[in-house]
Amino acid sequence: MFLLLKKLYITFARSSRIIITLVIIDQLSKWWFIDDLRWKPGLMLKVTSFLNMVYTWNYGISFGLMREYYQYSNAIFLITNTLIVCYLYYLMIRSKTIGSFAGYSFVIGGAVGNLIDRFFRGAVFDFIHFHYQNYSFPVFNLADCFITIGVIILIEDYYSTKKVIEEKAKGNYDNAQIEAMAEKIRNAGHNGDDIVN
């Protein structure tokens, strides 16, 4: 029990720096558009030929998906997103590589940023709009970017780890090499704690 509590504390101490930083960046960007610039829905700022800043409230999930179900979705999304964040945090505690730890931290940071919007404002504020000729990408925010980055990190980490396992199965790595790689991962980001088994 003590070891579990210790691991929970260590994971929280390390991940909170990343997560809180991402949440602050996300919320400051939204505050700047909503309160400081005092924009109103429908206003648009053309930044480049393919990038606009727009004022949009998203009543669905990331990138505006499922917004047509808003009349009964906000409470459901609040509960669902909270449960997802808790589950992701559980997975992060069990993470065995720096890549998965960082990936989960980014996804959680982005999810919490949007969760704050939904809890206090009833919807998520989106303002980044990419478009090219007749193609228009759904409007999103920095929290969505963090989630996407986190997913990319997790995918890359999964395939990197899978490659090492496959190479070991083929006999290309011996146990000493595997342990050396594990030790390198531990020392790189976890100060020697037993994150990699």
UniProtKB/Swiss-Prot annotation:
The keyword Transmembrane applies. PANTHER family: LIPOPROTEIN SIGNAL PEPTIDASE (PTHR33695:SF1). This is Lipoprotein signal peptidase. One of its GO terms (molecular function) is aspartic-type endopeptidase activity. The keyword Protease applies. Signal peptide: none annotated. GO terms for biological process: proteolysis. Its main location: membrane. This protein specifically catalyzes the removal of signal peptides from prolipoproteins. Pathway: Protein modification; lipoprotein biosynthesis (signal peptide cleavage). Belongs to the peptidase A8 family. It comes from Rickettsia felis (strain ATCC VR-1525 / URRWXCal2) (Rickettsia azadi). Its EC number is 3.4.23.36. The lineage of its organism: Bacteria, Pseudomonadati, Pseudomonadota, Alphaproteobacteria, Rickettsiales. It is found in: Cell inner membrane. It is an enzyme of class 3 (hydrolase). HAMAP family: LspA.
